[in-house]
């Protein structure tokens, strides 16, 4: 459902594994009826334009692209039949994924994490909202790959598995065009940590007042909740002391980034992004030396 960049990659992957499976492609744009790749496929049926949603109730599985608004589904629709590239990818590779979401800052943070890990010698790929559609990365994934995913609220809305390392930067009252309410948008963002498993990590900004409120008293279901803050808070989590960053977990306090000489991306908001990127990379196996080198060589 939705035949843009991600929808096309979904079609190609499914067709590669199931060359004669009947597929229905739904899109609001009627011009896809002229797409040469689709017109040459006798096992495809197109449902386009205003009538694209007329037969939603007849499908067993709906693979929804992130650009398709959830409001197109009828009230009380069985959402258990809705999945996505993000959902299926996380079900299979979630234990290798560092996922990043937030109303602001997610592209910078995702790119910085990818740069630190790649410059440290890890096999790293960037997928999701920036980088490749998830399905296009599958052929290159190895057991040692670190997969960085930038995730929008639309990509998170119908997932059933969260990333191994989840990062929630902030939530602000923006990008609400696909949602019936601000609360619905908030809940979609919170999905990034909602389905974590034992020994996963959920990093979230304690400096964002809404996140503090939403996650106050949150009980870990085996995963580790790690707030981060620009203030000097040595409780469990990530904190700044002068221009150094520390990670405090059950195993003690470790310095993970030394920014005494500054960082190449200006502003307190970017220092916060660099803090959580450093923590994610440390949890993914990078050393403090590798983190410092990666941060200093980042071009933004």
Specify the residue positions occupied by each region the protein language model found.
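Short beta-strand "acidic-cap" motif of Rossmann-like dinucleotide-binding folds
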Residues: 22-27, 125-126, 148, 227
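Adenine nucleotide phosphate-binding catalytic loops in nucleotide-utilizing enzymes
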Residues: 3, 181-186, 223-300
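Hydrophobic residues within alpha-helices
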Residues: 10, 109-113, 280
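Flexible, glycine-rich phosphate/dinucleotide-binding loops
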Residues: 7, 32, 91, 133, ...
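N-terminal leader/targeting and accessory segments in enzymes
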Residues: 1-84, 266, 286-289, 300
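Phosphate-binding loop of NTP-binding sites
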Residues: 15, 54-59, 66-223, 239
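Residues in the short beta-alpha loop(s) of Rossmann-like NAD(P)-binding domains
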Residues: 4, 29-31, 130, 207-208, ...
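Alpha-helix C-terminal capping segments
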Residues: 16-18, 116-120, 279-285
């Amino acid at each position: 459902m939705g035949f843009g960049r991600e929808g096309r990659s979904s079609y190609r992957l499914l067709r590669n594994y199931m060359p004669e499976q009947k597929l229905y492609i739904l899109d609001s744009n009627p011009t896809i009826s002229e797409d040469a790749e689709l017109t040459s496929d006798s096992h495809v049926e197109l449902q386009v334009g205003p009538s694209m949603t007329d037969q939603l109730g007849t499908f067993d599985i709906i693979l929804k692209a992130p650009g398709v608004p959830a409001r197109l589904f009828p009230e009380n629709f069985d959402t258990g039949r809705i999945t996505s590239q993000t959902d299926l990818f996380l079900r299979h590779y979630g234990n290798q994924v560092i996922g990043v979401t937030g109303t602001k800052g997610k592209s910078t943070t995702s790119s910085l994490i990818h740069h630190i890990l790649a410059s440290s010698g890890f096999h790293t790929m960037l997928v999701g909202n920036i980088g490749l559609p998830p399905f296009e990365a599958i052929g290159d994934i190895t057991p040692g790959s670190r997969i960085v995913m930038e995730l929008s609220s639309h990509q998170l809305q119908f997932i059933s598995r969260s990333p191994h390392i989840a990062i929630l930067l902030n939530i602000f009252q923006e990008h609400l065009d696909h949602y019936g309410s601000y609360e619905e948008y908030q809940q979609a963002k919170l999905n990034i940590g909602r389905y974590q498993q034992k020994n996963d990590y959920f990093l979230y900004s304690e400096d964002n007042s809404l996140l503090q409120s939403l996650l106050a008293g949150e009980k870990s279901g085996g995963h580790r909740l790690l707030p981060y803050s620009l203030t000097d808070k040595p409780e469990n989590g990530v904190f700044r002391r002068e221009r150094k960053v520390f990670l405090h977990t059950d195993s003690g306090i470790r310095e993970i980034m030394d920014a005494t000489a500054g960082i190449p991306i200006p502003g307190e908001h970017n220092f916060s992004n660099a803090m959580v990127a450093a923590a994610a990379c440390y949890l993914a196996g990078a050393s403090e030396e590798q983190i410092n080198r990666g941060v200093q060589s980042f071009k933004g």
